[in-house]
Amino acid sequence: MSTPIDTSAARAAIFKRIRSAHRRPASATAEELGAVEDYLARHPQGPRPLIEGDLRIRFRAMSERMSSTVDEVPHLADAPAAVARYLDAQGLGRQAVIWPALAMLDWAGAGVAVEARPPRRDESQGADPVGITGCFCALAETGTLVLTSGPQAHASTHLLPETHVALVPASRIVKGMEDAFALLRAERGGEEMMPRALNMVSGPSRTGDIELTIVLGAHGPYRVHIIVATED
């Protein structure tokens, strides 16, 4: 089994060398960071839809329009039992790969066997049919999951398995994409904190390349099931 690689140190070293080649300090100065924030604050934004009311309700409605299925539980601690019910209803085995960040939940108590590792890439070794992830945040405007990669959050977990189950705290639902990027800058804006990859998932993978007929699961998960923790 491969060991996840933390690339943040390598990325920081590359940026340091680039800045050094331009005879600039190794890290961004407070003045430079302030200039960036000022630019972002002043930069004109395009028209945005008016989103009012409960973001959770809007997110659920839009997710279901994108062919995701949605369940709700009070807390993330209740998610393992909800996952077990979903897997049983779909006729799937109670096995999954999971983000290491979620491994502390009581999966064994719910009867779900999880492995905190990336999915197998070689199908000859046995494909992993279910991947369980969290999310960085979610967009009420479009019913979209925003997922960032890292040592505790493998990007392949929501890309390779046929079924993707995502756990979403209601407190992490924001209005739209602009709000998600603002949250990312606020929480992970440092040079060594930005994720290597950011993916936005709006329902199952699909294509209409052949005769404009929509086919699900063409380039990724066939199913996307979202469990919202309403009080987290």
PLM regions: where:
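The feature marks the mature, well-folded catalytic cores of soluble enzymes
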Residues: 1-232
